[in-house]
């Protein structure tokens, strides 16, 4: 079967999803189309994501495809990138990159 992930960070390239193109209740939409939905309350937490993926793997062999809704904070961990759409599709300059990396000591390699 199939596992889909949806990043729900509340941002689009032109602003918040509520202001630009409100998608409504994504969970209800996937459910209406016959998907099993698993919610990940802290989609910025690697351990929680791994747990939800394991749950999805166990469920995806049943009758329904599985969707994991990841509630994330865009730019999480970098003070000047968090909670704004302005970094959607924009690369930091060298100075901003250095600052951002210094604010996030953990990497995927730590897991």
PLM regions with names:
Residues 1-111:
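Glycine-rich ThDP/TPP pyrophosphate-binding loop and its adjacent helix/strand module
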């Amino acid at each position: 079967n199939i596992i889909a992930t949806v990043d729900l960070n509340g941002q689009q390239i032109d602003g918040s999803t509520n202001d630009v193109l409100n998608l409504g209740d994504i969970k209800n939409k996937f459910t209406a189309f016959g998907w099993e939905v698993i919610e990940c309350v802290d989609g910025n937490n690697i351990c929680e994501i791994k747990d939800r993926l394991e749950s999805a793997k166990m469920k995806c062999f049943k009758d329904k495809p599985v969707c994991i809704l990841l509630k994330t904070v865009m730019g999480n961990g970098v003070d000047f990138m968090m909670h704004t759409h302005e970094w959607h599709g924009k690369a930091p300059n060298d100075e901003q990159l250095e600052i951002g990396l210094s604010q996030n000591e953990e990497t995927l390699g730590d897991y």
